[in-house]
Amino acid sequence: MEVAELGFPETAVSQSRICLCAVLCGHWDFADMMVIRSLSLIRLEGVEGRDPVGGGNLTNKRPSCAPSPQDLSAQWKQLEDRGASSRRVDMAALFQEASSCPVCSDYLEKPMSLECGCAVCLKCINSLQKEPHGEDLLCCCSSMVSRKNKIRRNRQLERLASHIKELEPKLKKILQMNPRMRKFQVDMTLDANTANNFLLISDDLRSVRSGRIRQNRQDLAERFDVSVCILGSPRFTCGRHCWEVDVGTSTEWDLGVCRESVHRKGRIQLTTELGFWTVSLRDGGRLSATTVPLTFLFVDRKLQRVGIFLDMGMQNVSFFDAESGSHVYTFRSVSAEEPLRPFLAPSVPPNGDQGVLSICPLMNSGTTDAPVRPGEAK
């Protein structure tokens, strides 16, 4: 079905508004057909080589941030295989992501399109300067350089961001953790063979905290020897998987997934480039996703129980407040070329915080496990 058949003007922003309404109302087929194409067109508006008013042709050099036709076809094929409920969440997240500034993480205000196709708020432009008062801007997403005199105001994206902001309450409701995700919950345990020697693990392999005394464990190739972290089991190669971690009163933690092949020796750096897709709590309440650079996150309340949903087919990993169901963050383009493992790192601040990370029992198990207490160790 073409947009013209419904009597709507065939412009990227009007298509996206129609898609957004379709997502909110539950009409998936129509929304799925247009949403990726619409958002890519809007993001490209104002990039050199495209007429920001009448469209026109792109230059023969496609900006690296813009999806190619092959990329769009692949995303569309993946969406076709999803259930309506899952697609609705994916589409809502895509709209929210497309209308957010990668610098300040807020809704775009007076968005400016860089040469690579990314858009940032006008007020955030100066923060991308490579040098003080310089003319070169370094994109925080693509690491490509744009000249100040080449950036353009993206008015279509500005109108769309304003429209999405008005519908934020409905989008938030869609992005809440769907209870049906729990049908993919896994009976996860901690892999003691990967645990740093300063970690204390409960006998049931479900709770972990940092200790001050080094444990006498066997020196194994899979063990983290410097960074205080641990992996979970099982390993994931396909399918969808959900688990929850009780972070309690911990003041610092890292949770997520990583490639099975990540380096275990020496001090590790948690970045997506090195195979870690994690959310971190630092400085008594600062939440961030370990992108490059960091993506700072804002939640309505302190997280105490974190839900993690891994979709190997869609190459996504999403984080939720498992108590309220609120969406926290979604990593996209998560590598599925090798097995992924759950990743946990409890707090190790100088004040000796005894924060415990506990894997929550399966919702239908009817049992609970006490977290490890000070003095207990494996």
UniProtKB/Swiss-Prot annotation:
SUPFAM superfamilies in alphabetical order: Concanavalin A-like lectins/glucanases (SSF49899), RING/U-box (SSF57850)
PROSITE patterns, per the entry: B302_SPRY (PS50188)
Tissue distribution: Seems to be expressed in prostate and less abundantly in adult brain, fetal liver, and fetal kidney.
Domain of life of the source: Eukaryota
A GO-annotated cellular component: cytoplasm
Zinc finger (RING-type): 101-143
Swiss-Prot/TrEMBL keywords: Metal-binding, Zinc, Zinc-finger
GO biological process: innate immune response; regulation of gene expression
Signal sequence segment: none
InterPro entries associated with the record: B30.2/SPRY, B30.2/SPRY_sf, Butyrophylin_SPRY, ConA-like_dom_sf, PRY, RDM_domain_RFPL, SPRY/PRY_RFPL, SPRY_dom
Record GO terms (molecular function): ubiquitin protein ligase activity; zinc ion binding
Name of a matching Pfam family: zf-C3HC4_4
Domain B30.2/SPRY: start-end pairs: 168-362
Classification via PANTHER family: E3 UBIQUITIN-PROTEIN LIGASE TRIM (PTHR24103)
Protein name in the entry: Ret finger protein-like 2
Organism lineage: Eukaryota, Metazoa, Chordata, Craniata, Vertebrata
Name of the gene encoding the protein in the UniProt record: RFPL2
